[in-house]
Regions:
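Extended, H/D-rich, highly charged conserved domains that either
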Residues: 1-128
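Proteins with a high burden of low-complexity, intrinsically disordered sequence enriched in S/T/G/P/A and R
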Residues: 5, 56, 62-64, 135-148, ...
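Phenylalanine-focused residue identity feature
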Residues: 21-23, 53, 91, 139, ...
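A Trp-anchored, charged/polar loop motif used as the substrate-binding/catalytic surface
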Residues: 28-39, 136-154
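Extended charged low-complexity segments that act as oligomerization/scaffolding linkers
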Residues: 121-146, 209-218
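N-terminal start-of-chain detector that recognizes signal peptides
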Residues: 21-22, 41-46, 133-135, 159-164
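SIR2/sirtuin-family catalytic core signature
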Residues: 144-218
Length: 218
């Protein structure tokens, strides 16, 4: 049955590992076509230490940061260690937004994605979406505080300022919490783009009682 094939196709596409490695390799190969960001060039310090959540070698190749000063906390291209997913128990997909009148003019209503899926009448479509959500939930990554600690210990890092750029601050809370506990008197600079990221940062600051934060809109 062609309708059953919808569900079967979802099951086939459950393994994203190969796609992730291919995506990361292509992104790394494209670095030769990317120009340095002016603001980042001002922010980055060649003597600083960097925790990047990026798989690619952007810092090394575009901004000439020595590789010894960089920790790829989620893995890096060229190594068999790429991680994808959410911290366990922290799966928070975006809400589903739809036009209540179906005329393209609103009003627009937000609902939890799983609530929307449960309301789909078509069995095949509902089952396919449920399979996809379940697979997304299964993609979780372990927090590697041990890697972060070893990196900081090895480099004997004495940190006075912590700069956060290009991170949504919606996940990876444990890393920020560890840094705040280890360097409790450090000055924090959060570069944010948009209201949602700013809200995430404010929550992060409040939850971790960060003493000296500064939020900079870009």
């Amino acid at each position: 049955d062609s309708r059953d094939s919808i569900i079967y196709q979802v099951e086939l596409n459950g393994n994203l590992k190969n796609a992730l490695y291919e995506f990361a390799d292509k992104a790394d190969d494209s670095l030769c076509n990317i120009q340095a960001n002016d603001l980042l060039e001002q922010i980055l310090d060649s003597d600083g230490y960097y925790i990047t959540f990026n798989y690619t070698h952007t810092l090394e190749e575009i901004y000439d940061i020595p590789w010894e000063q960089i920790l790829h906390i989620h893995g890096e291209v060229g190594e068999d260690n790429l991680e994808l997913g959410y911290p366990k128990g922290n799966f928070k997909p975006e809400k589903y937004t739809y036009d209540a009148r179906g005329k393209g003019r609103g009003p627009y209503v937000e609902t939890e994605i799983e609530e929307h899926i449960n309301g789909i009448e078509d069995y095949y479509v509902r089952t396919a979406y449920t399979e996809l959500i379940d697979k997304c939930k299964s993609f979780y990554k372990e927090m590697r505080i041990d890697l972060l600690k070893d990196f900081l210990d090895k480099n004997q890092c004495k940190i006075e300022e912590i700069i956060v750029y290009g991170h949504s601050c919606a996940i990876d809370f444990d890393y920020f919490s560890y840094l705040n506990k280890r360097y409790s008197n450090a000055y924090w600079k959060f570069y944010v783009r948009g209201a949602e990221q700013e809200s995430n940062v404010q929550y992060l600051i409040m939850e971790n009682s960060i003493k000296n934060p500064d939020i900079i809109k870009v």
